[in-house]
């Protein structure tokens, strides 16, 4: 078949999108606005335990949305404890009901799935619950869950297939372990849980499971939160340990065995040290794997049409306009090589791509200074460079790190967690002390970080922060009064909420 410019009227669709997650749906709705004929193919391959879900991708079904709701469940448990100090008479034995939480979370997700279906229908986007595979230039095969196949053609294609959790490849992992894909709809309380991994998924799940009263252990191969600021990562780990989450460091599981079937059952985990011959064993009700995620790019026929991928990671290299090496095929989201794996990034990239393709826009997605939040018990918000990356980029002598602990006023009456919340900015002294890294550990870190992210985009400097009057008494005001540098070695401990 010839190129898209030769036979425009011969295609079934202007754009076929493989993947109905946040990025794919954003691109579909945007393209449809410009009168284009668009199809979305979305298919969820069940997990080894058989878990599947509806339209909307990872974020809505098994990611950000259920994760934040369960984090909120844990925060409410803490709020109940705090409330006694504020005069509320709360029963001593407050219990958490797993089934009720799961039902509420799944009902909300179901309403979102339905909302996406309706939105596509209203915009006249054709949606098929089918697995898409390239079978030749401009052609794709769609296979539904009954095995029925259809062939479609399109002028352009967008790959937005996302990622799925990785397994260990050891005896018993797929038979007996769960992943985050299973956790948010788990029909029984997981009980005593081992979480394997040190990713943000691992630590967030550990945090909210412990927060609702479960016995939680995290098994870590090396460092926490690889790729994030390690100063912040270590503070998160310390706080979690102080709040009863156990860490087994420098061990990896080599075998998982079932001792007793049930919901939950009992499992034996055998693990080996990463730096010696030492072997340890432990018994748990549930083992949750959170060791990373792999791009869903290897079984969609990319080799048939010549799309290059990184053979090691499965990631797709693209131009700054999200174009693959095959001109009529584009890619967005978590499957891109060397790009940030976050829902809002995929949404932005999808919308802007459709605007460039169909509305004459030239605006490209900006992958720099993307804000993010890790919803651990002590939330971590970040924007810009980690301290390690700033040193690597500018040299240690050319950066100044301002930092301070702070104590949220609301925590002073329950008298908890003083000198645990932490604020840090990293400035480039060769560029007017421009803020190149923003980091905050504390309640509502995402809400705090979002506004500062806009300021960083505008070229925020330390002088501008200093001349900004803070709102009192809130956590974010600490950023208007940062005066102690790391280099000075001076104390940053706080005696009260107002420093």
Curated annotation (Swiss-Prot):
Cross-link (Cysteinyl-selenocysteine (Cys-Sec)): 497-498
Pfam families recorded: Pyr_redox_2, Pyr_redox_dim
Location of N6-succinyllysine modifications: 68
Residues binding NADP(+): 166, 198-204, 221-222, 226-228, 292-293, 315, 341
Gene3D superfamilies registered for this protein in UniProt: 3.30.390.30, FAD/NAD(P)-binding domain
More about this protein: The thioredoxin reductase active site is a redox-active disulfide bond. The selenocysteine residue is also essential for catalytic activity.
Protein name per UniProt: Thioredoxin reductase 1, cytoplasmic
Record organism: Pongo abelii (Sumatran orangutan)
